[in-house]
Amino acid sequence: MSARRRNQREDRESRRGQFLSADRNAAAPHYTPDGHVPRIQAAEAAAERGAPIVGLVFDRGVLLGARYDPMGGEPLPAFLGKNTSNLRGGKILRLGPRLALAGAGLMGDFAAVGRHMRGRRFSSTRAAVDYLGSLFWEHTVRHDTRILGTFVLMGSTLDGDARLFQFSPSGSIHEYVACVRGRASRTVNKRLAEDYRRLSLRRAESVALEALGQPEAYELFTVKT
């Protein structure tokens, strides 16, 4: 083999080795023990430790609810025991009469979600779901962003039908008729799945407060058809 051909072969092998190395390096953050998947699991665990939120589809829309708990011995907020759907900076974000979000977990991350969603006009439920889903996916798969440590429930009647969606730190999206996220959510979700029936608003409010643990301070908002 001539020196020229030998050099060309060595160059090809060198480039092939570089590509394989690049592939391995790209995969490593996702699948190594200290990589991306454990970070997703940690973000979901952090979100599950938050005070619970609930979403219920009822006969005329979607009801979103959120519980407020004092932290570090602080007193309960001034809206004790009231329906506080007008609360600024709360756990329920109204994006108009037909679209709203509720967040559990890291409230700074939920606020960041709100900044992206606020002020945008969505022509349909699908458009709103696609936009918020893309935001979660971007934070989940990119290496230069932090995974969002929040579960978000979206209630929408933009198309005339009442629909409820959950967005998780992993980037997954699920549609439900009843869902709880935050502390004790697994137990409550099982009970809701067994007992759920299409509800009136009054009954939905009662079920929501029960799912939230009959809190002293809470927030409710109705997305009506």
Predicted features and spans:
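Long, low-complexity N-terminal extensions
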Residues: 2-225
